């Protein structure tokens, strides 16, 4: 009969009850974890005290050969008791934490259903007050849990988001159809922006991949000095953003552009100038850069130095002079031949 005459509770009172139960369950989880650590600490300390008393008693009572056997037995027994007690204590507290986390998940799901019910049934002002009260609490708890540094949105954006939540389809259609008026200043600013700033306006730096290093990797890093602990970070001088890492030998000679602000950070030192060397010669006088070697060059020069067949006056005069010289050289040879014959 009580169910027939019972009045339905309002969503606001139900949300308050669920929020209180969620806070209670979170506090209970914290107390369970702290009590787990405290119990293990007191358990270990009590075993150490009992073991030290037992070792002193055996040292004073038993003789030399029996003393060592009893001490070894006590040590083995203490190790077994420690492991068994630790297993039992951790199992008990893990069961308690699983039970409370199950209740917490049920309470959170109930809270989300109640918030959806508030959005559907209540008026705009009442629903907005309830959502601002309970959704803010949920957002703050998630931020504290994840240790994130996110900025809260402005009140104007929050009001527009809440109004869009309760808007009808016709209102949403009108909102889409009416374009936002952009002034000339915004157009000029977008034109004056460089492509780098247009590309990196909403850029988020990539989180580095953290690999799990084994003992062998740590030994190699210690001897080779090639791990992340042996590198220098590239920090921007303007916005102090991390832009990667480099080896200590390359660090003074590296210039880089910042990922966040686009500032060009020059190198601290100028690198050593490497002298230009001539590429080595390959087979058949061909160099590695595709040029022709000295053997073919000399061949071409010899071909260019062949006697010319031009019939110019200078060439004919040179030819006549050469002919007269050859005749003068031939005359004494004939005279010598005649004298020898006679």
Curated annotation (Swiss-Prot):
<feature type="coiled-coil region">
    <location>
        <begin position="13"/>
        <end position="34"/>
    </location>
</feature>
<dbReference type="GO" id="GO:0007416">
    <property type="term" value="P:synapse assembly"/>
</dbReference>
<keyword id="KW-0479">Metal-binding</keyword>
<comment type="function">
    <text>Plays a role in tubular endoplasmic reticulum network formation and maintenance. May be involved in central nervous system development. Has a presynaptic role in neurotransmission. Likely to operate in synaptogenesis by regulating vesicular transport or localization. Required for correct localization of rab-3 and snb-1.</text>
</comment>
<comment type="similarity">
    <text>Belongs to the lunapark family.</text>
</comment>
<feature type="region of interest" description="Disordered">
    <location>
        <begin position="278"/>
        <end position="342"/>
    </location>
</feature>
<dbReference type="GO" id="GO:0007626">
    <property type="term" value="P:locomotory behavior"/>
</dbReference>
<dbReference type="GO" id="GO:0008021">
    <property type="term" value="C:synaptic vesicle"/>
</dbReference>
<keyword id="KW-0862">Zinc</keyword>
<dbReference type="GO" id="GO:0050803">
    <property type="term" value="P:regulation of synapse structure or activity"/>
</dbReference>
<keyword id="KW-0256">Endoplasmic reticulum</keyword>
<dbReference type="GO" id="GO:0016020">
    <property type="term" value="C:membrane"/>
</dbReference>
<feature type="topological domain" description="Cytoplasmic">
    <location>
        <begin position="90"/>
        <end position="342"/>
    </location>
</feature>
<dbReference type="GO" id="GO:0048489">
    <property type="term" value="P:synaptic vesicle transport"/>
</dbReference>
<feature type="compositionally biased region" description="Polar residues">
    <location>
        <begin position="295"/>
        <end position="321"/>
    </location>
</feature>
<feature type="transmembrane region" description="Helical">
    <location>
        <begin position="69"/>
        <end position="89"/>
    </location>
</feature>
<dbReference type="GO" id="GO:0007268">
    <property type="term" value="P:chemical synaptic transmission"/>
</dbReference>
<dbReference type="GO" id="GO:0046662">
    <property type="term" value="P:regulation of egg-laying behavior"/>
</dbReference>
<feature type="transmembrane region" description="Helical">
    <location>
        <begin position="40"/>
        <end position="60"/>
    </location>
</feature>
<keyword id="KW-1133">Transmembrane helix</keyword>
<keyword id="KW-0863">Zinc-finger</keyword>
<dbReference type="GO" id="GO:0005789">
    <property type="term" value="C:endoplasmic reticulum membrane"/>
</dbReference>
<feature type="topological domain" description="Cytoplasmic">
    <location>
        <begin position="1"/>
        <end position="39"/>
    </location>
</feature>
<dbReference type="GO" id="GO:0071786">
    <property type="term" value="P:endoplasmic reticulum tubular network organization"/>
</dbReference>
<feature type="zinc finger region" description="C4-type; plays a role in ER morphology">
    <location>
        <begin position="236"/>
        <end position="261"/>
    </location>
</feature>
<feature type="coiled-coil region">
    <location>
        <begin position="102"/>
        <end position="136"/>
    </location>
</feature>
<dbReference type="Pfam" id="PF10058">
    <property type="entry name" value="Zn_ribbon_10"/>
</dbReference>
<keyword id="KW-0175">Coiled coil</keyword>
<feature type="compositionally biased region" description="Polar residues">
    <location>
        <begin position="179"/>
        <end position="191"/>
    </location>
</feature>
<protein>
    <recommendedName>
        <fullName>Endoplasmic reticulum junction formation protein lunapark-1</fullName>
    </recommendedName>
</protein>
<dbReference type="GO" id="GO:0071782">
    <property type="term" value="C:endoplasmic reticulum tubular network"/>
</dbReference>
<keyword id="KW-0472">Membrane</keyword>
<dbReference type="GO" id="GO:0032880">
    <property type="term" value="P:regulation of protein localization"/>
</dbReference>
<feature type="topological domain" description="Lumenal">
    <location>
        <begin position="61"/>
        <end position="68"/>
    </location>
</feature>
<dbReference type="GO" id="GO:0043025">
    <property type="term" value="C:neuronal cell body"/>
</dbReference>
<dbReference type="GO" id="GO:0008270">
    <property type="term" value="F:zinc ion binding"/>
</dbReference>
<keyword id="KW-0217">Developmental protein</keyword>
<dbReference type="InterPro" id="IPR040115">
    <property type="entry name" value="Lnp"/>
</dbReference>
<feature type="region of interest" description="Disordered">
    <location>
        <begin position="161"/>
        <end position="191"/>
    </location>
</feature>
<feature type="compositionally biased region" description="Basic and acidic residues">
    <location>
        <begin position="322"/>
        <end position="342"/>
    </location>
</feature>
<keyword id="KW-0812">Transmembrane</keyword>
<dbReference type="GO" id="GO:0043005">
    <property type="term" value="C:neuron projection"/>
</dbReference>
């Amino acid at each position: 009969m009580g169910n027939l005459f019972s009045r339905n509770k309002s969503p606001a009172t139900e949300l308050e009850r669920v929020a209180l139960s969620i806070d209670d369950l979170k506090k209970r989880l914290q107390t369970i974890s702290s009590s787990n650590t405290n119990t293990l600490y007191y358990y270990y300390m009590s075993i150490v005290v009992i073991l030290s008393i037992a070792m002193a008693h055996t040292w004073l009572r038993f003789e030399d050969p029996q003393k060592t056997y009893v001490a070894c037995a006590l040590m083995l027994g203490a190790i077994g008791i420690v492991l068994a007690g630790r297993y039992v204590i951790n199992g008990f507290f893990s069961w308690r934490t699983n039970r409370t986390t199950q209740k917490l998940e049920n309470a959170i799901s109930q809270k989300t259903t109640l918030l959806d019910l508030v959005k559907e049934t209540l008026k705009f002002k009442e629903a907005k007050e309830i959502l601002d009260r309970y959704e803010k609490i949920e957002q703050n708890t998630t931020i504290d849990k994840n240790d994130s540094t996110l900025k809260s949105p402005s009140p104007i954006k929050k009001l527009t988001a809440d109004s869009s939540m309760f808007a009808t389809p016709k209102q949403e259609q009108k909102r889409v159809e009416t374009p936002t008026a952009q002034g000339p200043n915004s157009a000029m600013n977008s034109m004056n922006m460089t492509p780098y700033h247009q590309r990196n306006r909403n850029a988020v730096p990539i989180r580095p991949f953290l690999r799990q290093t084994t003992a062998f990797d740590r030994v190699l890093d210690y001897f080779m000095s090639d791990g992340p602990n042996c590198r220098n970070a590239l920090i921007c001088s303007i916005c102090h953003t991390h832009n990667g890492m480099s080896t200590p030998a390359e660090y003074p000679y590296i210039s880089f552009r910042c990922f966040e602000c686009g500032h060009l950070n020059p190198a601290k030192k100028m690198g050593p100038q490497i002298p230009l060397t001539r590429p080595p010669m390959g087979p058949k006088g061909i160099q590695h850069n595709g040029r022709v070697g000295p053997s073919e060059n000399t061949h071409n020069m010899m071909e260019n130095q062949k006697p010319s067949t031009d019939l110019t006056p200078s060439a004919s005069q040179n030819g006549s002079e050469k002919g007269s010289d050859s005749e003068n050289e031939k005359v004494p040879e004939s005279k010598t031949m005649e004298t020898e014959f006679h």
